[in-house]
Amino acid sequence: MYQNFGQFIDGKWTPSSDGGVYEVVNPSNEEILGNASKATNRDVEQALHSAKKGLEIWKKTPAWERSAKIRKIADLIRDKKDIVANWIALEVGKPFAQGQGEAIASADIFEWNAEETKRIYGQIVESRFADTRIQIKYEPVGVVAALTPWNFPTILAARKISTALAAGCSVICKPDMVTPGSVMQLVDIVREAGIPAGVVNLLSGDPASISSQLLSSDIVKKISITGSTRVGKIILKQAAEKVQRVTMELS
């Protein structure tokens, strides 16, 4: 099932640099779904440099153009909702109808952020000096590392990716090892929508090693994580070393 995917780096699906894979199991019947690609340190480095390059392109893309591409992602998710739902059903063990609901909700999030892209307003502030005004302009924070859980793999990846895209940021998404295909399918839709190479990247594999390498890099400027409180504490402590911005949703 995973042969068409792998690591998504610089706009392309590629196997891991050493060809490593791991088994993904269907929780409803404990059958092996297939072998998903397992990222190496080299893959992580390539993804980091890809995201850095993608940021330079995306942050200069006009808001209305970004909005149109994000809206196209929403439309494609709706067109492919049954494919997305099938991945969710197989990997998470949810009923197919719930998978469809998650797919539709994911599309709604992309549509919402497509419009929010146009509403990133600055401010004009009065100055203490005559004939002078202060302009406040918001700029993309930079490369975002998005760490997603297994229980709602598509909708939470959609929330993180679409928000980063709306703000003009590039993103490296790390799905849970249990549900890589659900997020891979979403990222492939992003590719199909014409998002420039390097703007969205995906790393599949061991969460601890990948997350640690991402956070230790000077390229990553923000981390978004949905996960356990235990993992959140680890992430927050590591991010503090570089004063990286962190957004957490913890259980």
Q: What name fits each language-model region?
A:
Residues 1-35, 68, 72, 122-147, ...:
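Terminal low-complexity tails and localization/encapsulation signals of metabolic enzymes
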Residues 7-9, 23-26, 35-46, 194-199, ...:
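Histidine- and aromatic-rich ligand-binding microenvironments
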Residues 31-121, 131:
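Glycine-rich loop-to-alpha-helix module at the N-terminal edge of alpha/beta enzyme cores
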Residues 25, 42, 46, 61, ...:
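An amphipathic alpha-helix/helix-turn recognition signal
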Residues 8, 55-59, 77, 165, ...:
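Hydrophobic residues in alpha-helical segments
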Residues 122-251:
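Rossmann-like NAD(P) dinucleotide-binding subdomain of oxidoreductase/dehydrogenase enzymes
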